[in-house]
């Protein structure tokens, strides 16, 4: 039997404003503004009241109905981003040649030097709105921060992929920069 309608609601916390205009969702919060375009999905996105966003799909296939929850998850990540922010921690792993990481251009570009003893300098540019710094507390650790989860995670992925070992047995040569922790910038007090 075909499902007639699938709908989900997202509760919006106090202190945030969410605008929806033709499937373009804008979330404003204390850490900034995030916009996301959902025009590629044929779903209804509307504000029921200033504190509730409703996403629904009528007479959809299984895949189209699944997109309803996906949109809600993206909006929840945007809400989390403008309230708490996202933070990824990366550690450099090396057996012999110590990897040297230097941030330049206002913490938006990272230069990776001495990877496997190579002279080549790897430069990785962060996504807009993402900063990278060397951790003051922990040796060989990078901290990547930003409001957009997609931008922070893709920047971390670019750093990790820039230090892939070529033409060697990757089980033996484990050198590189790897994500060690995923958290928010502002941590909840327990």
Swiss-Prot record:
| Entry keyword annotation includes Ribosomal protein | yes
Q: One Pfam family this chain carries?
A: Ribosomal_L6
The question of whether Cell wall biogenesis/degradation is a record keyword is answered with no
Q: Which UniProt keywords apply?
A: Ribonucleoprotein, Ribosomal protein
GO molecular-function annotation terms? rRNA binding; structural constituent of ribosome
Which positions form S-S bridges? none
Q: Where on the tree of life does the source sit, at the highest rank?
A: Eukaryota
- One cellular component (GO) term of this entry: cytosolic large ribosomal subunit
Coiled-coil region(s): none
Checking InterPro entries in the record gives: Ribosomal_uL6-like, Ribosomal_uL6-like_a/b-dom_sf, Ribosomal_uL6_a/b-dom, Ribosomal_uL6_CS2
Gene Ontology biological process terms, A to Z? cytoplasmic translation
Q: Which family does it belong to?
A: Belongs to the universal ribosomal protein uL6 family.
State the name under which the record lists this protein: Large ribosomal subunit protein uL6
Source organism: Spodoptera frugiperda
Which gene is annotated as encoding this protein in its UniProt record?
RpL9
